[in-house]
Amino acid sequence: GATTSRLHTAVKIAPAYHAPVVHVKDASRSVPVLNQLLSPNTRRKFLDELETGYRQLRESYSTSRKNNLYISLAEARANKLKTDWDHVQIIPPARPGIHVFRDFPLEEIEPFISWMFFFIVWQIRGKFPELLDDPVHGKEARKLYADALTLLDRIKMEKLLRANAVVGLYPANSVGDDIEVYRDESRSEILAVFRNLRNQEQKKPGVPNLCLADFIAPRSSLQIDYIGAFAVTAGIGADQLAEEFRQKNDDYSAIMVKTLADRLAEAFTELIHAKVRRELWGYASNENLSLDDLLMERYIGIRPAHGYPACPDHSEKQTLFTLLEAEKNARITLTENFSMVPAASVSGLIFAHPFSQYFFVDKIGRDQVEDYALRKNVNPETIEKWLASNLNYR
């Protein structure tokens, strides 16, 4: 899943278990792996290649750890992204506040589906639609595509999956590495505070140590800035439909349901983000991009998701969900470990800063762990548990 990685499996998990441990990016990829493990003809070769790959990852990781140099949190903050906020055009949202989309038509979401990523889930790589004519994988790809479209048509006709979303657009300012979200432009009432982490790698001259707070005007600048938050799902009904197929011993269709729900959720997120840029916020009202342009992220701004490299702490989803009232407005909930239910859901923040970019927080030092724990009002051990794969001292 998204919270795991092949590197973490190779370095931390596999050495601690007596039997083979295989990392897959999501559940739908388990079937091809299991087929190779269960077949006497492929099992040994698969496991040998797996262990070779893991060994290479461990060696590469060990070398990089020795070569990587880290700086103190104070030094990293001194090397933050420098923005002349007096010369940045900050555009207030055209329609601030909460926007709720319930039972959004799947027909409008479908054009935003990335079929290339659909095929990657089934371990078929290539550019779509050229992939359908590939001499090696074309036949299999065409069957998968036809099956997916047939099921998607049934889902749309019988309304078997439902898509909901909630978006919030608010005044905001950064205070240090945190982002304060306000009820209105008086900034007298704080609705939420997002705690962020800063990259601590030693950089080349002129390269900043980034933090998401760098993309929001500091309160000390006297500028009122803005931030967006969103939670999107296209998975309401997916578990029930998949279970119906499983009861009929049709695991293929059960996996297809989950795969389509995931693709629809990502497509819905793309649609909602475009709607925010062009209409609700309107900071890119003249934007006219193709689907390929959207998937290549050729738009202004970013939408980082908690649990991913720029903001690896999943627990910050709780702040996001409380701010958006995501359970009431979109029927999305969080588990005790901050996974989203339905699984085919996406959430995160929206930044409009013209130079905002995705980046890796990567490894952080004990000084940042202690600072972050203080800001979140938890003990450092809790942070070490949540961010175990992000520590540079273990």
Regions of interest found by a model, annotated:
Residues 2-5, 23-25:
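Conserved phosphate-binding/catalytic loops in two-lobed NTP-binding clefts
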Residues 3-17:
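Glycine-rich, charge-decorated loop segments at or immediately adjacent to ligand/cofactor-binding or catalytic sites
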Residues 7, 11, 28-32, 262, ...:
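Residues on a specific face of well-ordered alpha-helices
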Residues 13-28:
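Structural recognition of alpha->loop->beta junctions
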Residues 14, 35, 39-43, 124-127, ...:
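Non-catalytic alpha-helical coupling and interface elements of nucleotide-dependent molecular machines
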Residues 25-255, 259, 278-280, 289:
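Active-site loops and adjacent core secondary-structure elements that bind or stabilize anionic groups
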Residues 209-215, 220-394:
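C-terminal accessory domains/tails appended to large, multi-domain proteins
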